Amino acid sequence: MHVPPDHVISTQATAVLAVLQQAIDHVQQGRPVDSFLQQLYRRHREYGSRDRRLYSNLVYSFFRWKGWTDLAPALPLAARAAAAYRLDFPESHPALDKLAPLDAPVQQAATLAGKAEQVASWLGLPTPPPAAALVP
């Protein structure tokens, strides 16, 4: 993977966190996240395919694994979002590494139990979260 210059990574890190926060606000108002992303991409034609892929993957991963990452509310949003992203995409993005570097190794877990163990290690949870926590 090509690694962009540090100033580009910093800009992407700031942008991705802002997009995620806007998506959270959108969902808290009772609106679907896919409509938010659609509106975002229409407003910002300058976002290329890589930007759109990063934003979409991060936002959907965040909401997919929210039941687990919310078990560590003291952690910053960036750390919880990066952990959720890494559950789906073990090869992280440089912008996410800048926002929330992980001490533990990232490996693709094949089972839900394996993913729960990874989340526990990344977020500092005493035990792996139960699968039932994923269902609202």
Regions picked out by a protein language model, each given a short descriptive name:
Residues M1-P136:
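Class I Rossmann-like S-adenosyl-L-methionine
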